[in-house]
Amino acid sequence: MEKRVWDWGIDLGGTKCECVVLDGDEVLLRHRIPTERHGGYQHMLGQIAKLVDECAAKLGQHPALIGMGTPGARDPQTGLLKNSNTTEFNGKPLKEDLERRLGVPVLIANDANCFALAETHLGTVRQHHPDAKVVFGIIMGTGVGAGIVINGQILNGHHGIAGEWGHNVLLPEGPECYCGKRGCVETLISGPALEAWYEARTKRRLSLAQIAAASAHDHVARLTMDRLHLLFGQALANVINILDPDVIVIGGGVGNVQSLYRAGRETVLPFLFNPRFATPMVAPALGDSAGVFGAALLARGVFREALLS
């Protein structure tokens, strides 16, 4: 009997790398190990190989193909990774280096694309908006990014940067961004950016969740949340005016702020080229599992031909 080919996915982060192996919708295995970023690029490649070997030993089967979600994106012209906040990966031929190490084809996609793909095919979009053709899947946490799924497949774009709304400039004189620009969305409404804005005015360091909870009685906390809502609405309206998605999924730590679904939503309309804002804004169903599940979906049949070409 021919051995069944399972779907292997790896979510590569700056802190940990996680592997999942799927048989259809069934999770056969989940396993994670530290990325050990301090060891440098070659050491991190070794950690990924170690993760694959450990999973293969548990399953008694090596992968035929691996999907991988990465910070940053693979440049379609050069094949090098770029725009990663785990800067050790930038300028490196990650796909080719991993294929040499692992001995199997590796399909690479931005981690936000993997998030959007998983929520479309396995998560909240499949459950509640199955007819959606265009999905904008937002991650708002330490950074701000997004993935775009159209007719079930990732949109990468000519430069491989489709969905990177976190690096649209909102305030040209705003804070410096690691990308080299100033006033990017990420420098304004990421979790660390909002926490820093609050701390600069109060000399108190609170988490965003604590700031949100204090906003009913703390004036600066209220201003911080107002800033989030206003800039979120402006930034999202710019996306909607171009993409006009059927559904918007909001993940990440900032995405857990419930007022985004009310006050944040209300601030979209003044910047929108339409008299109403009717697009569903929904929370993800898969939590922090979405990225690794999306990576596994990269290795599933319907995506292989497009991504290998």
Regions found by a protein language model. Give the residues of each.
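Adenylate-forming
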Residues: 115-121, 146-148, 168
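ATP-binding/phosphotransfer module of carbohydrate and carboxylate kinases, centering on a glycine-rich
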Residues: 1-65, 75-78, 96-104, 121-131, ...
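A charged helix-plus-loop insertion that forms the helical arch/lid used to bind
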Residues: 79-90
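Structural signature of FAD isoalloxazine-binding scaffolds in flavoprotein oxidoreductases
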Residues: 161-164
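Short beta-strand segments
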Residues: 11, 67-71, 109, 136-143, ...
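ATP-dependent carbohydrate kinase catalytic cores
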Residues: 105-120, 129-130, 136-138
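Generic beta-strand structural signal
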Residues: 104, 133-138, 142-146, 150, ...
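Short hydrophobic alpha-helix segments
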Residues: 31-33, 85, 158
